[in-house]
Curated annotation (Swiss-Prot):
It comes from the Eukaryota. This is ATP-dependent RNA helicase TDRD9. Belongs to the DEAD box helicase family. DEAH subfamily. Its main location: cytoplasm. SMART domains: DEXDc, HA2, HELICc, TUDOR. It catalyses: ATP + H2O = ADP + phosphate + H(+). Residues 377-544 form the Helicase C-terminal domain. A motif (DEAH box) lies at residues 254-257. One of its GO terms (biological process) is male meiotic nuclear division. Residues 142-308 form the Helicase ATP-binding domain. CDD domains: DEXHc_TDRD9 (cd17988), SF2_C_RHA (cd18791), Tudor_TDRD9 (cd20431).
Length: 1382
């Protein structure tokens, strides 16, 4: 036996490429245990060195990536093989050492079960096992497992491998009172938990006692558990942490044919540890469909100078036979009409769907035929109709098939979808028995291929397709691609039938296509998916370079894939970026503190980084919620028929943040607060709350569990959620939200996107001068479209209150009502309307043909109305030719001078207010109007008040109550909020006090004026500290304008809003410009006016240079227009009284559109010119520019990206629109990029831009990761001090995420809080400077994406003091400064 090994010898065991020296032995090598005769027949002699340890894989059979197999050059292929050969030869040398140090005996007798456990009696002998194919081999298979290190069990689906074999082993040990600890892996959670539950129920054991399970967060097991089922990932995490298998006596790995990345890495680690420190653990591999020889050779063991393959045991027999059929075998279909299958184009055509539906309808005949009773009547029809399992590739196909089947109303089918995104309650329905006389149809993805067994399935319909996760060669972004399933997978699917009776499998491909085109095996995930988490686990194992260990995998990944993953881990910060570029190792890197954290978290790398940065900046709680929510299925419900309501609800949760992630946080916190206050005490209340708020309760509970799990896991790294309650004033809340948005940008670097600018001139023309914030455009309007205005109004009712519709030829402009006391922004109703278009909601009108209308209205020349512009005003309930009503309500008509004296009555926000003119003329008009109204005998409203209704409402002034013209804003209970249209203020009024307004009082234009200070926008400080303006800015502005008489100078009139300069007179002093005061205080900054405003300004200058009288011509009605008005009235009456008959045509409208809708593009080099789509569930799936005149770049951050099969289009998920702060995209990029190179102008006097990425290779001059390089041109001026501030903030981050004696694990809570506060203040200071950065015209570098373009003499190193002392494992290196000339 071995003497005690030294620490150095143990470390050498675990490092590939090192040999163990100076090993002292006692005794001689033992004889290998004798196996059964069958074992000797199956074993093949393999010469030393010729086994799997020395053989490179056949790369042609397993291409490194599906798209790259034909592109990779021969030299690349040879280097891939070379690295695998090199490290497998090193492994073979280790085996030679292994043979020389084998101990003479086993590990000694295990302690008895009774001594180790309080479970003293496990009634294994009294249990009667079910009669399954494996039952007849019980003794033999247990004996083989005990006699061999590794056994491979191959048997048909349903033979009893997963449920019976672990029990055989358990009972074997119980009968001998010997200790055992058996773990069985399952690829899916549902499989592990359901099998454990089934066994405990069969054996009448308490779940969590002898048998238990652990899936992700949920562990139902105790110290007494002897048989535990768990997912592959859970076991892998346990083994990597322990670096040993000795926690278990038996490891049973089920479904090994599923070549996931986790599965292959688990096999690699188990194989490695079996040969080092865990040689007495028994390993069993099981599957119904695997290439046994490949696995047997992989687990070959050295015996007497030979490599002996692992033992293969065949379980013969099946529960019931399953017959296979192909399209050729189906006689009832017209084969000539079927679309041919193409290997290059995996797709389900409409005719193949129809074949599946027809098959399902034929199963009744088949059931009758099989029962031998063909004369059954409908009343005697089979009460138990066998279930059908249909395999489809994805949710879209499931939904389509679901619609086809549910339309067969009289066929008595119960259709259930089975997909990972389907609500959990619905998933459980597949296990329920159908209603008697009904047939259960399960539409499933490959989730039902293994682990999930529905026992009553008799028929399987297989489209032979799947969606596989692949990694794009160029971008490394993942995408789910439709592809043909492998024969292995299809055979696994076939095995789902025939559990309780004879089964049938229908493969919807032709037999020759199956034989010649369907691949035999699936391409292992390790060859087509990112390797990040695997490489981090390799680094934790500390067994040498990642490529050395991965070379020994069953299907080793390509060397280029390993190199790329190392670079991506350096980009995210899990591996350190070397300060000296020449020291950079492309195949390895030092694990940073962040890397160690990521390796321990059950979330992807970017979400792990989010948690760590959340800890740094004091928003850990929010980041934990986001990470938990994004790791699991989205808890926001977007029902197919109620998608718009679900979207609206999500927008409401996000507030004004425009962030999916913040919506998740707010929804989670609201749910949690409701639970804590007892509102959701009962499950029924909670479910109702979930339905009302479009939240899936089971999923949000899962998020809560993962949140708690993550909180526990990070506590070992001294990261804790701050339990102290901060001062929760409004400014703190908004600052916290901004910091969280910055943290999101840091975590999801480089998923950065900017927007193309809309053409304002074209947009104004497209909207015909309508307000883009309130209006959408429809196209393909039928002739005489104004007849259908009520239909059109009802189509948009779910979006918001329609104020007016203007019909202009084949176009219509739908304008929504805006609350006059809300800030300027694009209305939610406009977003909802554009969302309808995105969701392809059908906008269909029932119409008459133009000829029919003209034919039925005799004696009238109505044809002239075909293209007349008609305005339908719902507020005034009028339908007029456009010119008659166009200017009557336009407030610009009340402007008879560019200088006005006003009283402010209502402040909406900073720079936006209502008031009325107090000159003598206007005062007289208001006085006369008020007197006339209050002399009338007022009549109550004839109908219930509704938003937009114009009426008369009381207002108490100087203790005297009088009535004034008012508009209802909204109704709540027994009161309404009204807006006084002649003064601009608002008030709450009891409903019974509202009175009807006589028609004559609607003729005078509303006298209140709406004002907006021109050429001003919020500063960064205001945007960060408030919703749009900070509380401080709002209070300061209110103090300047309230209770004062102001002088305003009109710059322009845009959509009835006066854009003005505002002056305040104070005593005898000169006038104070209020905009200048706000800028001096740091609340505002200068900006450009919009194109429309500038146009209006020019028009006003022209008008006021002439006589004022010329301004009133537009409102004079023309006789011709009166004639058109009469014809419109006649047509409307004919339509409403049904004189035209019932409409017999349908008109499909196109739209709605808004020309200010923004399209985004990527900042990274590889994706700059790719088309970008934002997933429809995202809040930002619709983005409309509120300020098209502001040309500063705006930025969007995406939590995850994927691309389509062709690589042409990117899909963004969980997006956040960053605040519109000038220079923000450049600042965020510099702050979070691993390496930057500043661009300077030709004279070296100022910075013009920055190149961000991983830097360049000094030896070749090439970019290290060119695909993710980002070139930005600055649109504001940055100084040397700005770059220094960025470095100071990076250094502050490093202090909270570093290892070592001064690392964050050693800091006390007070010091952590102090460092967090410093980081927060530095971050806010970087973005909120007292003086805004100067605007400059962007100037692109003449050599974009080229590194090393700065004279080295101008470059100044900024090395961190601590990084120069030794090994550098900081998260962020300090950027090199470029010195500017004077």
């Amino acid at each position: 036996m071995l003497r005690k090994l030294t620490i150095e010898q143990i470390n050498d065991w675990f490092t590939i490429g090192k040999t163990v020296t100076n090993v002292e032995l006692l005794g001689a090598p033992p004889a290998f245990p004798a196996g059964a005769a069958r074992e000797e027949v199956q074993r093949q002699d393999v010469a030393p060195g010729a086994g799997p340890a020395a053989q490179a894989p056949a790369l042609a059979q397993a291409p490194a990536r599906p798209a790259a197999a034909f592109e990779r050059s021969l030299s690349q292929r040879s280097s891939e093989v070379e690295y695998i050969n090199k490290y497998r030869q090193l492994e073979a040398q280790e085996l030679d050492v292994c043979r020389s140090v084998q101990p003479t005996s086993g590990p000694g007798p295990r302690p008895s079960l009774a001594k180790l456990s309080s479970v003293t009696c496990i009634p294994g002998t009294t249990y009667k096992y079910p009669d399954l194919p494996i039952s007849r081999y019980k003794e033999e298979v247990v004996s083989l497992i005990e006699s061999n290190s590794v056994v491979i069990i191959h048997g048909a689906t349903g033979s009893g491998k997963s449920t019976q074999l672990p029990q055989y082993i358990l009972d074997h040990y119980v009968q001998r009172s010997a200790y055992c600890s058996i773990v069985v892996t399952q690829p899916r959670k549902i499989g592990a938990s359901s099998i454990a539950r089934w066994i405990s129920k069969e054996r009448a054991w308490t779940l969590g006692g002898v048998v238990g399970y652990q899936v992700g967060l949920e562990k139902i097991a105790t110290e007494d558990t002897r048989l535990i089922y768990m997912t592959t990932g859970v076991l892998l995490q346990k083994i990597v942490s322990a670096k040993s298998l000795m926690e278990f006596t038996h490891i049973i790995i089920d479904e090994v044919h599923e070549r996931t990345e986790e599965m292959d890495f688990l096999l690699l680690v188990v194989r490695k540890l079996l040969r080092t420190n865990s040689r007495f653990v028994k390993v069993v591999l099981m599957s119904a469909t695997i290439s046994c020889k490949e696995f047997a050779d992989y687990f070959a063991v050295p015996v007497q100078n030979k490599m002996n393959p692992a033992y293969i045991f065949e379980v013969e027999g099946k529960p019931h036979s399953v017959e296979e059929y192909y399209l050729n075998d189906l006689e009832h279909i017209h084969h000539s009409k079927l679309s041919p299958h193409l290997l290059e184009e995996p797709v389900i055509t409409k005719d193949i769907y129809e074949v599946a539906v027809s098959l399902i309808q034929m199963f009744d005949d088949l059931d009758m035929k099989e029962s031998g009773n063909k004369a059954w009547s409908g009343a005697q029809f089979v009460l138990e109709r066998s279930s059908v399992l249909v395999f489809l590739p994805g949710l879209g196909e499931i939904n389509y098939m679901h619609e086809l089947l549910t339309s067969l109303v009289h066929k008595r089918l119960q259709v259930y979808p089975l997909h990972s995104s389907v609500a959990l309650e619905e998933q459980n329905n597949v296990f329920l028995s159908p209603v008697p006389g009904y047939r259960k149809i399960i539409l499933s993805t490959n989730i039902a291929e293994s682990s999930v067994t529905v026992p009553d399935v008799k028929y399987v319909i297989d489209f032979c397709l799947t969606r596989t996760l692949v990694c794009d060669e160029d971008t490394n972004y993942q995408s789910l691609r439709l592809s043909w399933a492998s024969k292995t997978s299809c055979n696994q699917r076939k095995g789902r039938a025939g559990r309780v009776s004879r089964g049938y499998c229908y493969r919807l491909v032709h037999k020759d296509f199956w034989d010649n085109s369907i691949p035999d095996h699936v391409v292992p995930e390790m060859l087509r998916c990112p390797l990040g988490s695997t490489i981090l686990k390799v680094k934790l194992l500390d067994m040498g370079e990642p490529r050395a260990l991965l070379a020994t995998a069953l299907s080793p990944p390509g060397l280029s894939d390993i190199e790329r993953t190392i670079l991506l881990l350096k980009e995210v910060g899990a591996l350190a970026v070397s300060g000296q570029r020449e020291d950079e190792n492309p195949h390895d890197g030092e694990l940073t503190f962040l890397g160690r954290v990521l390796a321990q978290l059950p979330v992807n790398q970017q979400l792990g980084k989010l948690i760590v940065l959340g800890h740094v900046f004091g928003c850990l709680d929010e980041c934990l919620i986001i990470a938990a929510a994004l790791s699991l299925k989205n808890f926001f419900a977007m029902p197919f028929r109620q998608h718009l309501d679900g979207y609206r609800n999500k927008v409401n949760f996000s507030g004004s943040s425009k962030s999916d992630c913040i919506a998740l946080v707010e929804a989670f916190k609201t749910w949690k607060a409701c639970r804590q206050t007892g509102e959701l005490r009962y499950p029924k209340d909670e479910l109702n709350w979930g339905r009302l708020n479009y939240i899936q309760i089971k999923r949000i509970r899962e998020v809560a569990e993962l949140y708690e799990e993550l909180k526990t896991r990070i506590s070992q790294f001294n990261m804790h959620v701050d339990s102290r309650r901060p001062v929760m004033d409004q400014e703190y809340i908004y600052k916290q939200r901004f910091i969280l948005q910055v943290v999101l940008a840091g975590a999801f670097y480089p998923n950065y996107f900017t927007f193309g600018q809309p053409d304002e001139e074209m947009a104004v023309r497209e909207l015909a001068g309508k307000d883009p914030k309130t209006t959408v455009v429809l196209k393909h309007i039928p002739p005489y479209g104004f007849l259908y205005y009520k239909q059109l109004q009802s189509l948009f009712r779910q979006c918001g209150q329609v104020k007016s519709i203007v019909f202009d030829g084949a176009k219509a402009f739908v304008e929504f009502s805006r609350n006059p006391t809300e800030r300027f922004k694009t209305l939610p109703a406009v977003y909802m309307a554009i969302k309808m278009s995105q969701l392809k909601v059908s906008l269909e009108l029932s119409v008459h043909s133009a000829e029919e209308i003209e034919g039925k209205v005799q004696g009238m020349n109505v044809s002239k109305l075909r293209n007349t512009r008609v305005n339908v005003d719902f507020q005034k309930q009028t339908v007029d030719p456009m010119q008659v009503s166009f200017n009557t309500s336009d407030r610009s008509q009340t402007v008879t001078d560019l200088l006005l004296t006003i009283d402010v009555t209502e402040v909406v926000e900073v720079g936006h207010f209502w008031g009325y003119r107090i000159d003598e003329n206007n005062s007289e008009i208001l006085k006369k109007l008020t007197a006339e109204i209050n002399q009338l005998t007022l009549v109550p409203l004839p109908t219930h008040p509704h938003p937009d209704l114009v009426c008369l409402a009381p207002f108490a002034d100087f203790d005297k109550q009088r009535y004034f013209r008012a508009q209802v804003l909204y109704v709540s209970g027994n009161s309404a909020e009204v807006f006084f249209v002649d003064y601009g203020n608002k008030s709450h009024v009891d409903l019974h006090l509202l009175m009807e307004i006589p028609c004559q009082f609607l003729e005078l234009p509303f006298q209140a004026l709406e004002f907006k200070i021109c050429k001003m926008r919020p500063s960064a400080k205001s945007l960060v500290c408030g919703k749009h303006w900070s509380d401080g800015a709002s209070q300061w502005f209110a103090s300047l304008v309230s209770g004062c008489t102001l002088l305003v100078k009109v710059f322009s009139v845009v959509h009835s809003v006066l854009h003005v300069d505002v002056y305040q007179y104070s005593g005898v002093q000169d006038a104070i410009n209020i905009r200048d005061v706000l800028i001096q205080q740091g609340y505002a900054e200068l900006t450009e006016e919009s194109y429309e405003s500038k146009q209006s300004h020019e028009v006003l200058k022209g008008l006021f240079s002439k006589s004022v009288e010329n301004m009133t011509d537009g409102s004079v009605p023309f006789p011709m227009k009166d004639d058109e008005k009469y014809l419109i009235r006649i047509l409307l009456e004919s339509f409403s009284t049904n004189k035209l008959g019932t409409p017999n045509c349908k008109a499909e409208l196109h739209g709605p559109f808004n020309p200010y809708e923004l399209k985004c593009h990527s900042l990274t080099r590889i994706s700059k010119f790719r088309c970008v789509w934002i997933e429809k569930e995202s809040i930002n799936s619709v983005i409309i520019s509120d300020a098209p005149e502001d040309l500063h770049q705006r930025m969007l951050v995406a939590a995850s990206l994927s691309i389509n099969a062709t690589g042409s289009t990117m899909l963004l998920r969980e997006t956040s629109l960053m605040p519109h702060i000038p220079g923000l995209p450049a600042l965020l990029s510099m702050l979070f990029a691993p390496v930057i190179e500043l661009r300077i102008d030709q004279n070296g006097k100022y910075y013009t831009g920055v190149l961000c990425g991983l830097g360049w290779n000094p030896a070749t001059g090439a970019s290290i990761l060119p695909e993710h390089d980002m070139e930005l041109a600055f649109d504001v001026q940055f100084s040397v001090e700005d770059v220094v501030e960025v470095n100071i903030l990076r250094a502050a981050i490093n202090k909270l995420v570093c290892d070592g004696p001064n690392g964050c694990k050693c800091l006390g809570p007070e010091r952590v809080a102090q460092l967090q506060d410093i980081a927060r203040q530095k971050l806010l200071g970087l973005f909120c400077q007292s003086k805004p950065r100067e605007k400059i015209v962007p100037k692109w570098h003449e050599k974009p994406y080229e590194w090393n373009q700065v004279d080295p003499k101008l470059v100044m190193e900024q090395a961190d003091r601590e990084s120069s002392r030794g090994k550098n494992t900081f998260l962020y290196q300090l950027h090199k400064l470029v010195v500017l000339g004077t």
